[in-house]
C-alpha cells in the first residue's frame, strides 16, 4: 500500500519524504542477537549501552556492517518505493561517514534525492565526535557532499540547532505545542530573529 501511495504521488509530481530512525533502538533487537555488542555504542568496557538519544540504546552507525545496513535499506526504499528523500531522526548521533555513504547511495539512483535531519548535539558538552568518529552534527555537514547531480555538490541538510536552542532559551519552553502558544511566546517584544543562531 505504501508503495502504491508513493507511486501515485510521484505520478502527480509530488515526492514523499520518509522519516527514518537509525540512531537508536532496543538493545534486545535482532541486531544484538546476530553479533552481541557490535551494533551498539557502549561504555564501561562494553557493559553499558549509551543512550544519548534518550530514546533507547545508541546504534554504532560508525561500524561497517551497520553503515552497510543503512545504505542498503535506503537503496531499497529509493529503488522500490521511489521516495524523494529522507528525514533523519537525531542525525547528530549518526557517523558523518555513514551519512556520506548514505547520500552517495541514494543519489546514485536518483541525484535529486534529498537527505536532511536533526543535526544537533545532545548537550552543550558534546563535541560532535564518538571515540574518534566525526558525527553528522551541524558543523560537520559542510565536510560532506556528492558529485551525483551533474557535478553539483549535493549536500545533507539540517534543521538549525542554533535557532532551536535560541527559541527554547527565548521562550523558556523546551516545547511549544501549538501555533497559538508560539504566537504568544514571540509577542513579548523581543525579536528572536536578530539573535545569533550559530
Question: How would you name each of these model-derived features?
Answer:
Residues 91-97, 122:
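Acidic-and-aromatic substrate-binding clefts and catalytic sites of carbohydrate-active enzymes
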Amino acid at each position: 500500500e505504501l508503495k502504491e501511495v508513493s507511486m501515485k504521488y510521484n505520478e502527480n509530481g509530488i515526492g514523499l519524504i520518509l522519516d527514518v530512525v537509525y540512531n537508536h533502538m532496543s538493545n534486545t533487537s535482532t541486531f544484538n542477537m546476530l553479533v552481541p555488542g557490535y551494533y551498539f555504542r557502549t561504555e564501561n568496557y562494553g557493559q553499558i549501552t549509551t543512550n544519548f538519544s534518550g530514546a533507547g540504546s545508541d546504534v554504532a552507525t560508525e561500524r561497517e556492517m551497520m553503515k552497510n545496513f543503512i545504505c542498503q535499506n535506503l537503496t531499497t526504499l529509493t529503488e522500490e518505493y521511489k521516495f524523494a528523500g529522507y528525514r533523519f531522526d537525531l542525525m547528530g548521533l549518526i557517523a558523518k561517514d555513514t551519512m556520506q555513504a548514505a547520500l552517495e547511495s541514494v543519489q546514485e539512483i536518483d541525484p535529486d534525492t534529498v537527505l536532511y535531519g536533526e543535526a544537533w548535539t545532545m548537550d552543550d558538552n558534546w563535541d560532535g565526535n564518538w571515540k574518534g568518529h566525526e558525527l553528522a552534527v551541524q558543523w560537520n555537514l559542510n565536510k560532506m557532499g556528492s558529485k551525483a547531480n551533474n557535478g553539483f555538490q549535493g549536500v545533507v541538510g539540517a534543521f538549525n540547532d542554533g535557532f532551536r536552542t535560541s527559541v527554547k532559551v527565548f521562550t523558556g519552553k523546551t516545547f511549544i505545542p501549538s501555533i497559538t502558544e508560539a504566537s504568544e511566546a514571540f509577542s513579548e517584544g523581543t525579536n528572536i530573529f536578530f539573535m545569533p543562531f550559530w
